[in-house]
Regions:
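Histidine-centered catalytic/metal-binding microenvironments
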Residues: 426-494
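Secondary-structure boundary elements
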Residues: 138-147, 151-160, 314, 350-353
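Glycine-rich, aromatic-lined ligand/substrate-binding cores of catalytic
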Residues: 225-351
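Short, conserved catalytic/metal-binding motifs centered on acidic residues
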Residues: 6, 145, 344
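Substrate-recognition/cap regions that form aromatic- and gly/pro-loop-enriched pockets
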Residues: 312-313, 317-444
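Second-shell loop/turn segments in exported
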Residues: 118-121, 131-139
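Short Pro/Gly-enriched beta-strand edge/turn motifs at strand-loop
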Residues: 61-65, 146, 322-330
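A contiguous strand-loop segment
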Residues: 2-128, 148-280
Length: 494
């Protein structure tokens, strides 16, 4: 899917957490209803069959419970998308990325071929529909997640190019697929953050480490031979740049991808480089924007939400620009776009006990008009307000309420913006207050069963707060838009 990802190492975050976050976006002209749920080991089959590619994969024993963001409407696969398992390992998948004809000609994508005449069908590989479901219930560390997914890619292949993030309390790893069966992965340095639009991003790779100590780099078993045989290394100095070797530098990237990376890097490092003007080090169309940077200050969840909601505020490219030169207005693809399905920010807090370490921040619909809210991830069930999404528009769940707020606020932007700013701050503040309150209760409780009940009680309280504030905001935004109707008239009846 068309998405945007941010990864924050533990030394770059405000509290020592590892944080991984992704906007999950539908393709143009589509919207996908999502629900926040828990998948239990007994719900997993012995053999997995993909709806889209028809590939069948036997699943191992020893599964773990995990949270997920599956599609609310059945029929096109699970698309679990993002979650945290019972071992406090987080995963988000996938960020659709780009490739080039040299790679795809050497290792074609493994696409499903339907039966034709007397020829039987040929299953395809794995894809975004499948990846979280196939990996997250079976791993106990971020590195283990890379190795399991890498093994599946080598055995079954994939029909699309994807980037996938894994985290535990100590590490974050980022994996990128290369062609049908190859892959690379890099450990995110502790003191940096990573920004990822929809293109292959890793810009340095140490093959010696990947085939040696494997401290910071991992890859498919025959990657070195694959590169040499197909003349993929374009460097003049022998330092492999995966972005040049395996990625793209298309004109479309300069409208759809590089501007997003430019804006996020500019936000966290405004003084490190010159970002605008004739003497700019980097522009929205630069192909060499860094994959990772050390931020100028520590990064908070609120920073991540702002970046993943952005539409180039403060630049000539803002689609909501209402003054000055508007010639570049809306020139680039926004990060907070109309077709954001959800955003999940997974936070592993090192200063909390393992049982309550993982917090999952959730937002639905267009990030430019929503708010995110924290929930304890180590639970048996999620609140109904976030889990009861269906394909029918309704105001008794967070997904559809968020969609309605976004559509109406977009149409009444200048009038509704302050309602949205107050809504977001109120939910973030109240959500943090409730987590702080229940962290203290959990620390004081010695009984494990009671602590489990407290985590679910906390999530219920957070959801109740959220539902009240979302309904209030919907009411206010509806009023603003109703007041702008074309059949309005200023005189009241006598």
């Amino acid at each position: 899917m068309a998405c945007t990802t941010i990864l924050v190492g533990k030394a770059a975050s405000y509290d020592g957490s590892t944080m991984i976050a992704r906007n999950d976006d539908s393709g143009s002209g589509h919207f996908t209803a999502k629900k926040f749920t828990v998948i239990h080991p007994e719900e997993l089959p012995k053999t997995y069959r993909s709806v889209l590619s028809h590939v069948e994969i036997p699943l191992p024993e020893g599964t773990l419970r995990f949270t997920a963001m599956p599609n609310a409407v059945e029929g096109k696969g699970i698309w679990a998308a993002s979650g945290v398992n019972a071992a406090n390992v987080g995963m988000t998948a996938t960020e659709t990325i780009t490739s080039n004809p040299r790679v795809l000609g050497a290792d074609p994508l493994v696409e499903y071929q339907p039966a034709k005449g007397e020829k039987p069908e040929v299953p395809g590989g794995i894809g975004e529909e499948d990846i979280v479901y196939l990996v997250l219930p079976y791993i106990h560390s971020a590195r283990e997640g890379v190795l399991r997914l890498g093994s599946l890619l080598e055995q079954y292949g994939t029909y699309e190019m994807n980037g996938i993030a894994f985290q535990d309390v100590n590490e974050i790893w980022w994996l990128e697929t290369i062609g049908g069966h190859h892959w690379i992965a890099r450990r995110v340095p502790d003191d940096v953050y990573v920004v990822m639009p929809n293109q292959l991003g890793i810009d340095t790779f140490d093959l010696e480490d990947a085939f040696g100590a494997q401290e910071n780099y991992l890859c498919s078993a025959d990657l070195r031979e694959f590169i040499a045989k197909n003349h993929l290394d374009l460097s003049l100095d022998g330092a492999l740049n995966p972005r040049d070797a395996f990625g793209s530098h298309d004109d479309a990237d300069h409208v759809y991808n590089t501007p997003r990376a430019w804006y996020m890097l500019r936000y966290l490092n405004p003084r490190t480089w010159v970002w605008e003007g004739a003497d700019a080090d980097y522009t929205p169309m630069s192909d060499d924007l860094p994959w990772c940077m050390v931020p100028e200050r520590k990064v908070t969840p609120e920073d991540i939400k702002y970046m993943l909601s952005s539409h180039y505020q403060g630049t000539p490219y803002d689609p909501y620009l209402s003054y000055g030169d508007k010639s570049a207005k809306g020139a680039y693809r926004s990060i907070g776009i109309n077709r954001n399905d959800f955003m999940a920010l997974l936070q592993m807090r090192p200063d909390q006990p393992e049982e309550s370490r993982a917090v999952e921040w959730v937002a639905y619909a267009s990030n430019a008009f929503n708010t995110m809210v924290p929930f304890y991830a180590n639970v048996e069930r999620t609140p109904e307000y976030l889990a009861n999404t269906t394909g029918t528009v309704a105001t008794d769940n967070f997904y559809w309420t968020s969609r309605l707020i976004a559509a109406m606020a977009d149409a009444s932007y200048n009038k509704s913006l302050f309602h949205l700013e107050r809504y977001e701050e109120a939910v973030l503040s109240a959500g943090r207050a409730l987590v702080n309150q229940y962290d203290a209760k959990l620390a004081a409780e010695s009984d494990a069963a009671r602590r489990a009940a407290l985590r679910e009680e906390a999530n219920t309280a957070i959801a109740a707060m959220l539902q009240e504030k979302a309904a209030d905001t919907l009411d206010k935004v509806l009023f603003e838009l109703s007041s702008q109707m074309k059949n309005a008239y200023s005189r009241s009846d006598a």
